[in-house]
């Protein structure tokens, strides 16, 4: 898939239990993500993909275990380190999470205003650059309601890239998009990895994206409350002896040859 990931570790998850209201949804989750890797978290509805993502980015506190970024533990016990680490990754939420009352340029500017001491002119220049990097040159003064769903996803991605993060998390980026628009977004994700060496973690159930751009995946299962498979998706589809894995990856007409 383009740039070869390095052997250096960008994310390490060890013995993670996560859930809500005192109930564990996932138990003993352990995996690593290499720098520059496009890594997918996959599985059926209700398996805990979004719960795991929220725990990785710090929205939810883990019930047990540890998440580390480049060897540094992401812990609420160290607020200064937590803020430092928050600056090293960007997030594209499922709906794009753009403020409807702000233009695209203003939306992309928000992280820069929050986390940097750049001047207004510098922030404007960076926001325009990030919009250009996702193919939205000339759309800075548009509001989210004035553009298509695919363009809103691109604008959300531009905001996620505003601080030049080492890691970007994408939550169901293809949701609500037609197949052509979804494929174009996949191509953009590949371009971002190629240009910047960004580590990209994607929550998805879309087979076209899984087979199209993922270097490796972990598959979650609701019944197991954990990981039931991990590896390259094409290899898993061909060689896994777990019916849950093959049934998920061999849906539709996208079985890899």
Q: Where are the regions a protein language model picked out?
A:
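A short, proline-enriched helix->beta-strand linker immediately N-terminal to the Walker B motif
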Residues: 162-166
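Conserved ABC transporter NBD signature motif
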Residues: 65-74
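Conserved ABC ATPase "signature" region
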Residues: 120-139
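ABC ATPase NBD coupling module
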Residues: 74-90, 120, 236-240
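Helix-to-loop junction immediately C-terminal to a conserved catalytic motif
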Residues: 57
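Conserved ABC ATPase signature
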Residues: 143-147, 151
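Catalytic Walker B motif of ABC-type/P-loop ATPase nucleotide-binding domains
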Residues: 168-171
């Amino acid at each position: 898939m383009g740039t070869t990931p390095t052997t250096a570790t960008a994310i390490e998850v060890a013995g993670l239990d996560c859930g809500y209201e005192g109930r564990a949804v996932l138990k003993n989750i352990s995996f690593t993500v290499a720098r520059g890797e496009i890594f997918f978290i996959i599985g059926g509805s209700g398996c805990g993909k979004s719960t795991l993502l929220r725990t990785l980015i710090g929205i939810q506190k883990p019930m047990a275990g540890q998440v580390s970024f480049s060897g540094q533990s992401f812990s609420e016990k160290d607020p200064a380190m937590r803020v430092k680490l928050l600056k090293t990754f960007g997030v594209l939420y499922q709906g794009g999470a753009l403020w409807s009352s702000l233009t695209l340029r203003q939306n992309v500017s928000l992280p820069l205003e929050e986390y940097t001491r750049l001047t207004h002119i510098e922030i404007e220049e960076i926001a325009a650059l990030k919009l250009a990097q996702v193919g939205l040159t000339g759309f800075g003064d548009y509001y989210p309601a004035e553009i298509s769903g695919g363009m809103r996803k691109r604008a959300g991605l531009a905001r996620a890239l505003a601080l030049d993060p080492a890691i970007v998390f994408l939550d169901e980026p293809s949701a609500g998009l037609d197949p052509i628009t979804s494929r174009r977004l996949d191509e953009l994700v590949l371009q971002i990895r190629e240009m910047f060496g960004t580590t990209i973690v994607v929550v998805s159930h879309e087979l076209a994206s899984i087979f199209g751009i993922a270097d490796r995946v972990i598959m979650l299962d609701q019944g197991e409350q954990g990981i039931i498979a991990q590896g390259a998706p094409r290899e898993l589809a061909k060689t896994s002896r777990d019916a849950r894995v093959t049934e998920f990856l061999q849906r539709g007409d996208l079985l890899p040859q």
